[in-house]
Regions:
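A helix-centric hydrophobic-segment signal that preferentially recognizes long
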Residues: 1-141
């Protein structure tokens, strides 16, 4: 074999090694991105489940408070609208925005509760408040 042929074979071998290495890196990065994407989807699914649980607890909580604070109708309407927005939200951004509305409405409801000491001693209210607080903690994590 001539020196020229050996040089061509060496160059081809080096190019093939570079191509194989680059392809291997591409496959590795793609697999990593796919697995990270799946992890994000799974995490968002868990958030979605907790948001749904929270939305399911709110009507009972509101009904308990309504019995004591019937004059606070606007707050109950705000909570109903915010809950409806959360349940009908499609994208994560819409759910985050609706959750913010619901947080604000629930905050106003909890301020109302402070004006009714007899409500704070109601067993059903306390249980629902504990469940809601536990759900809020799961959302925060």
């Amino acid at each position: 074999m001539g020196k020229g042929l050996i040089a061509v074979v060496v160059v081809i071998a080096i190019v093939l090694l570079i191509v194989l290495f680059t392809f291997g890196q591409y496959v590795s990065v793609k697999n990593t991105l796919v697995s990270k994407n799946e992890a994000v989807k799974a995490a968002w699914s868990q958030v979605d489940i907790v948001l749904q649980r929270r939305a399911d607890l709110i009507p009972n909580f509101v009904e308990t408070v309504k019995g004591y604070a019937q004059q606070e109708v606007t707050v109950f309407g705000d909570i109903a609208k915010a809950r409806s927005a959360l349940l009908s939200a499609g994208s994560p951004q819409e759910k985050i925005a609706a959750n913010g509305q619901l947080d604000g409405a629930l905050g106003r409801l909890l301020l109302i509760v402070e004006n009714y000491p007899q409500l704070k001693s109601n067993e059903n209210f306390l249980r629902l408040q504990d469940e809601l607080a536990g759900t809020e903690n799961r959302i925060a994590v």
